[in-house]
Design a protein with these regions (language model features):
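Proteins synthesized as precursors that undergo proteolytic processing into mature forms
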Residues: 1-78
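Cofactor-centric catalytic regions
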Residues: 53-111
């Protein structure tokens, strides 16, 4: 699940982890969004300029600011945007993992 949104969710998580210092799980637990502006890869290959979907826990101020800037914002159900998992092996051999809490579809398991 995810189609054209997967790469967007992964990029948001990656930037949070690499540039904003969030750990694996914090980056996944933070609010997610995706754009529907570009032509879809799958039939019927729709393009919805200016449209985006965002989770409500980003806050009303952010949602209002996006709308003021002309975005067509759809507010999704809480914890419903994005499906992510991540794993990291530290230089000391420690394995770290994280899984999205969204829709209870993922687990982080290591050995």
């Amino acid at each position: 699940p995810g189609g054209d949104q997967q790469d967007q969710w992964q990029l948001v998580w990656f930037l949070r982890f690499v540039h904003h210092g969030l750990d694996l799980q914090e980056g996944m637990d933070a609010p997610l969004f995706h754009s529907m502006h570009f032509q879809g890869s799958f039939f019927p290959r729709e393009c919805r300029p200016g449209e985006m979907m965002i989770e409500p826990n980003v806050g009303e101020k952010v949602i209002a600011a996006l709308r003021e800037r002309g975005h067509k914002v759809t507010v999704a159900e809480p914890w419903s945007v994005g499906r992510l998992t991540a794993a990291l092996r530290e230089t000391d051999g420690t394995l770290r993992a994280a899984a999205t809490p969204r829709l209870m579809q993922a687990y982080a398991v290591g050995r």
